[in-house]
């Protein structure tokens, strides 16, 4: 596998001063980098039965469908409100300064479906935790939460306690 960290551009003071942004577009444009991410996630989850890979808007949509294909599973998008055409279930969750809402089609996850949740980044864990609650409320079983990058200093993994959490890359600042 290529050195994935070397393919990620670090952008200081984006989107606001004091934030160091990890830009994955440089990793995505490199075929070995993109393949390395999908292969790394696939290798971790290959021995777990996965019915559905759920991708969180927006960058989770980049990785989740490719991983679903690699695992022989289906793909379900979780989106911001009013982006899906059929009847949806929704969850509103707390952010540091307010709330946010996620939706998925009501018929997307069946009772007992084994669901792997995928996103590009684990920060505080709020969005991933909300997605896991949505899956469980729909009768699904969360078999794991997979991320390309984990910002360990934000302790999102602790918020997801009780779930199998895996990240390919960890940053401590």
Curated annotation (Swiss-Prot):
The lineage of its organism: Bacteria, Pseudomonadati, Acidobacteriota, Terriglobia, Bryobacterales. One of its GO terms (molecular function) is AMP binding. This is Adenine phosphoribosyltransferase. Pathway: Purine metabolism; AMP biosynthesis via salvage pathway; AMP from adenine: step 1/1. Its EC number is 2.4.2.7. It holds the Pfam family Pribosyltran. Belongs to the purine/pyrimidine phosphoribosyltransferase family. The keyword Chloroplast does not apply. GO terms for cellular component: cytoplasm. It is found in: Cytoplasm. The gene is apt.
């Amino acid at each position: 596998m290529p050195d994935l960290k070397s393919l990620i551009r670090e952008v200081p003071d984006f989107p606001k001063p004091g934030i160091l942004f990890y830009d994955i577009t440089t990793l995505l444009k490199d075929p070995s980098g993109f393949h390395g991410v999908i292969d790394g996630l696939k290798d971790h989850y290959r021995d777990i039965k996965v019915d559905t890979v759920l991708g969180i808007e927006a960058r989770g949509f980049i990785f989740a469908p490719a991983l679903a294909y690699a695992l022989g599973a289906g793909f379900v998008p979780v989106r911001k409100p009013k982006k899906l055409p059929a009847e949806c279930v929704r969850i509103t969750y707390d952010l540091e300064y307010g709330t946010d809402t996620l939706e998925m089609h009501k018929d997307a996850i069946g009772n007992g479906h084994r669901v792997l949740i995928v996103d590009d980044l684990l920060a505080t864990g709020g969005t991933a935790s909300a997605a896991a609650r949505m899956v469980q409320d729909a009768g699904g079983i969360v078999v794991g939460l997979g991320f390309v990058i984990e910002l360990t200093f934000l302790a999102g993994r602790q918020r997801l306690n009780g779930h199998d959490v895996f990240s390919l890359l960890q940053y401590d600042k």
